[in-house]
Amino acid sequence: MPRRGLVAGPDLDNFQRRYFTPSEVAEHNQLEDLWVSYLGFVYNLTPLVEEFKGDLLLKPILEVAGQDISHWFDPQTRDIRKHIDPLTGCMRYRTPRGRFVHIPPPLPRSDWANDFGVPWWKGANYQVGRLSARTRNIRIINTLATQEHTLQVGAQESMWEILHRYLPYNAHAASYTWKYDGKNLNMDQTLEENGIRDEEEEFDYLNMDGKLHTPAILLYFNDDLTEL
């Protein structure tokens, strides 16, 4: 039986978000739960860490858990930056933090296995979504329960994605009509496309605290039987 009753929209039980904020990535900073971001995408490297558990080559990766490592990469080639090795005169990967998993040693070695296929940073195996280029705060007010929550969301996210973020606070969020300024919101569009402007830069220009005016979305309950 569908959990969402008569409400139109995506299957939220199997919903995949497209965007993650930098603060969300930063939460995944443990050995058993390690994410990083680079070149606009977010990657879950936990399986890689598990595979090479105990290997010293993991150290540079563990040191940047939950961080953006775009500076490791050449944005043109999307490969790890390279330089001329002063010892060999050969082109090598530049790894100032030390060599890490799938980076070849500076000199030929018989104990280095290169049969791993595609290096972890080149494929999409670990990719979980995009990094939000810009974030903003939004207030969501449940008019039925008179509860208010402030969420940080990505500016590129659709209302469905924002609703998915809100589910921990209200499991029946899809059973509500979402409104702003008296108008129903198009759940397939972003906040900006729905006319909810991000005025943070204007507040900064005026030396005013933008938190004093965080847009509020009002939720009105629909009796769609999902509470049964």
Curated annotation (Swiss-Prot):
GO terms for molecular function: metal ion binding. It comes from Mus musculus. One of its GO terms (biological process) is regulation of cilium beat frequency. SMART domains: Cyt-b5 (SM01117). Pfam families: Cyt-b5. It is found in: Cytoplasm, Cytoskeleton, Cilium axoneme. PANTHER family: CYTOCHROME B5 DOMAIN-CONTAINING PROTEIN 1 (PTHR21281:SF0). This is Cytochrome b5 domain-containing protein 1. Radial spoke stalk protein that binds heme under oxidizing conditions. Required for the coordinated beating of multiple cilia maybe by functioning in a redox signaling pathway. One of its GO terms (cellular component) is cytoplasm. It comes from the Eukaryota. Heme binds at H83. SUPFAM superfamilies: Cytochrome b5-like heme/steroid binding domain. Keywords: Cell projection, Cytoplasm, Cytoskeleton, Heme, Iron, Metal-binding. The lineage of its organism: Eukaryota, Metazoa, Chordata, Craniata, Vertebrata. Residues 17-83 form the Cytochrome b5 heme-binding domain. InterPro entries: Cyt_B5-like_heme/steroid-bd, Cyt_B5-like_heme/steroid_sf, Cytochrome_b5_domain. Belongs to the cytochrome b5 family.
